[in-house]
Amino acid sequence: MKINSNESLAKKLSLRTASRSKNEAYSDILLDGNKIGEIAFSFYDDINAVGIGNFEISAEHRGKGYGTKVLKFVIDKYKKKFDLIYCFVDADNYGAIKLYKKLGKVFDEDGPNVNNQYYVEFYNNGVDVE
C-alpha cells in the first residue's frame, strides 16, 4: 500500500505485508521498493483496538521524516477501522519518544510503568483503557 509522498519526501514510501494472521500483522516499510524498516500490529477484537509494535526505521534512514510519515499514515488508515490505536515505548527509546512528541503526544509526569515503558495513545474513540 502506497503512502502518499509530499513534496519534501521525493522518494516513495510504502508498506508491504510480510505476514498476517487473525490477530497480528507484520509489514516492511519500503522506500523506492527497498526495505528501510518494519512495523508490527496486534489486533484486539474485544475492544476494537490495534497496538503498534516493533516500529523501526533503519539507522541510516532515521531523522529524514520517514517514521513520521509512516506513523501518520498508519494512524489515519486505522482510525477508520478501530476505536483505539496505541503502543508502549521503552523509557530509554529516546528516538521513538522524540517522534511521538513531534506528533503531539505528552508523556506521564509520573514516569514509565513498572516495565519501564510509557503507554502512548494515538487515537481513542471512547475506549476505556483504565
Model-derived features: where do they sit?
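Conserved beta-strand-loop-alpha-helix junction that forms the acyl-donor binding cleft
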Residues: C87-I97, K101, N113-Y123
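Conserved acetyl-CoA pyrophosphate-binding loop and the N-cap/start of the following alpha-helix
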Residues: H61, G65-F73
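A short, internal acetyl-CoA/4′-phosphopantetheine-binding micro-motif in the GNAT/acyltransferase core
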Residues: F55-R62, V89-D90
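Residue-level detector of high-confidence beta-strand sites
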Residues: E38, D108-D110
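Acetyl-CoA-dependent GNAT
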Residues: M1-N54, S58, K77
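Short hydrophobic clusters on alpha-helical segments that form packing/core surfaces
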Residues: V74-Y78, A96
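Conserved GNAT acetyl-CoA-binding A-motif
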Residues: Y78-V89
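Active-site beta-strand termini and strand-to-loop segments that position acidic
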Residues: L30-D32, F122-N125
